[in-house]
């Protein structure tokens, strides 16, 4: 659900002045016991106040929620929207949500709240058409066919080359003409297309790991380039038993993918540009961590 552009600008300008840089070293952050403690985040004072005052009303549907409405994708009444950071992303993101996924437990909503112009959420079986754009789209999901982020550009270029071959495979065209046309196409490809080839959209499945198979095996997602985050570990408080700690929550997967994409594909130094994607997540993580340490039985009520 989109918000008006003027609000985007206002949020971006106001939060730039409130930006709080706690640490600049992403490597140190990942290596530490608490991987979220060194993030460059906007002030979370608004969340602290909201947590103290308790649930508030969604101005759209009237529902009682903590921090934000997970059905309307907007902050609640006691969390002013201008105090929520706005994150600019280098890619568009589609999230395919399992219909049985509990909205209040999903972290996918965080991405929509914090980067609304770049993120779309679809509820399965609703899936966009990707077949004609498989050379610029990747599905972020582990599996035997998955590749690492650093190999994305190579594999997308191979797809473009395969598409060129397919277009020139005309049985009615003399073979020598087909060969010449193909050579010319590859020449053009090397001169222009490959240089400008970039990933434009990434897809995530939002579901418990036990329910992902239904979406993952859907024919509309078959054949897409599959990418796995193999070195990151989750700190999600709802970690599922029997699953490796490299199986991330949705917002963790989005965040870590973008950090690695920034350094491995864009070849730029990461300076916390996407850390605010964990604005809600890191706050909830700390709340629950503190509650567990104090033996608070109300831990489950701290989040939806």
Swiss-Prot record:
The UniProt record lists the keyword Chaperone: no
Positions occupied by motif DXTW: 206-209
GO cellular component, one term: nucleus
EC number(s) recorded for this UniProt protein: 2.5.1.25
Residue positions, PTM N-acetylserine: 2
Range of residues in the leader sequence: none
Catalytic activity: a uridine in tRNA + S-adenosyl-L-methionine = a 3-[(3S)-3-amino-3-carboxypropyl]uridine in tRNA + S-methyl-5'-thioadenosine + H(+)
GO biological process, one term: tRNA modification
Cell compartments where the protein resides: Nucleus
Pfam families to which the protein is assigned, alphabetical: DTW
Keyword tRNA processing: yes
Keyword line: Acetylation, Nucleus, S-adenosyl-L-methionine, Transferase, tRNA processing
One Gene Ontology MF term: tRNA-uridine aminocarboxypropyltransferase activity
Superkingdom as given in the UniProt entry: Eukaryota
Similarity annotation: Belongs to the TDD superfamily. DTWD1 family.
Function according to Swiss-Prot or TrEMBL: Catalyzes the formation of 3-(3-amino-3-carboxypropyl)uridine (acp3U) at position 20 in the D-loop of several cytoplasmic tRNAs (acp3U(20)).
Name of this protein: tRNA-uridine aminocarboxypropyltransferase 1
Species assigned in the record: Homo sapiens
Lineage of origin: Eukaryota, Metazoa, Chordata, Craniata, Vertebrata
């Amino acid at each position: 659900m989109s918000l008006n552009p003027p609000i985007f600008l206002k949020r971006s300008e106001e939060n730039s002045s409130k930006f709080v840089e706690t640490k600049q070293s992403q490597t140190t952050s990942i290596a530490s016991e608490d991987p979220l403690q060194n993030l460059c985040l906007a002030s979370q004072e608004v969340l602290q106040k909201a947590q103290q005052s308790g649930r508030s009303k969604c101005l759209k549907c009237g529902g009682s929620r903590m921090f934000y409405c997970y059905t309307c994708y907007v902050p609640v009444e006691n969390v002013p929207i201008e105090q929520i950071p706005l994150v600019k992303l280098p890619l568009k993101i589609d999230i395919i949500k399992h219909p049985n996924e509990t909205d209040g437990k999903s972290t996918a909503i965080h991405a929509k709240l914090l980067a609304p112009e770049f993120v779309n959420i679809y509820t399965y079986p609703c899936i966009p058409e990707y077949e004609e754009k498989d050379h610029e789209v990747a599905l972020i999901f582990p599996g035997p066919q998955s590749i690492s982020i650093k190999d994305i550009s190579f594999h997308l270029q191979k797809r473009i080359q395969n598409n060129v071959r397919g277009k020139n495979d005309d049985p009615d065209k003399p073979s020598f003409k087909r060969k010449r046309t193909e050579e010319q196409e590859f020449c053009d490809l090397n001169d222009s297309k490959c240089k400008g080839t970039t990933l434009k959209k990434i897809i995530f499945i939002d579901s418990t790991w036990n329910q992902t198979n239904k979406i993952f095996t859907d024919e509309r997602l078959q054949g897409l380039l599959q990418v796995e985050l193999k070195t990151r570990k989750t700190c999600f408080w709802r970690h599922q038993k029997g699953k490796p700690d490299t199986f991330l929550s949705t917002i963790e997967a989005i965040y870590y993918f973008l950090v690695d994409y920034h350094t491995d594909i864009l070849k730029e130094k990461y300076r916390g540009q996407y850390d605010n994607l964990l604005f809600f997540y890191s706050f909830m993580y700390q709340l629950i961590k503190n509650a567990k340490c104090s033996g608070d039985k109300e831990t489950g009520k701290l989040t939806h």
